[in-house]
Amino acid sequence: MTEEQRQLYLAGGMSEEERSLFLKGIHEKNLVMFKPSQMLLHGPTKRLVDTYHWHSPTKGIVASYTPKGRDVEDHFGIFRGVDQVEAFAQATIVSCATFLECRKQNCTPDQLKDKFIPAFISIGNVNFHYYLEQGDTFISIGNIKFYKWRQMVCDGRIYKVPAGLNLDEYFKDFTEERLLKYDISKDFKLVAELFDITGRAILIELFKKSE
């Protein structure tokens, strides 16, 4: 999807055929068949997810991102811890909750954006074990702990990916059991552990009332 197509999509410019195919994927498949640009409202400079590699709609997700030059600018070439948390949140509570809400309401993200604003509610503990530089591909592995009333809570981990590894191939047979145990190769380097990352889709009317 080009940026021009994305803007048309977010503006509600999907054709009926495209919308039908999108909804078919929402109801019958999972996030792996979608690009993050189709699910996340963030523009290209603030979107911190490149690819969805594995997804179980009610259990969790594995997604990846590779920090770009703009992500480490003026920060010694290091991808900041706060951006790691943001990347994890986009991959988990935002992507997964958007998918489930679209399924529930039989709609697309562009229709959701007219009703709700995604909001970061709270963060539990975050423990950093390693660092990430420009070009270091990492995965966010997220476990869904709670989802109700458009609010989602996830725990998870961030791992640096071994150089040259094909993530689509590696995770094609991944399971919910392995997800819960973080059962992956020791070649992955643990970067961060995250707990109780919480977000909620809030009605736009509530924001307008507070103005």
Question: Which functions belong to the PLM regions below?
Answer:
Residues M1-F79, T108, F116, H129, ...:
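Non-catalytic linker/capping segments at the edges of enzyme domains
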Residues Y52, I121-L165:
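Hydrophobic beta-sheet segments that form the core/acyl-binding groove
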Residues S64, H75, L100-K104, C154:
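Short linear functional motifs in flexible/disordered or boundary regions
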Residues T66, Q90, V94-T98, K145, ...:
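Short alpha-helical scaffold segments that flank and stabilize functional sites
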Residues P67, A89-T92, G124-Y130:
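Generic secondary-structure microfeatures
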Residues D71, G81-E86, K104, S140, ...:
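Short, low-complexity, polar/charged sequence segments that are solvent-exposed and flexible
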Residues R80-K113:
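Active-site helix/loop of acyl-thioester processing domains in fatty-acid/polyketide metabolism
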Residues L100-L132:
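Extended, positively charged loop/linker patches that create polyanion-binding surfaces
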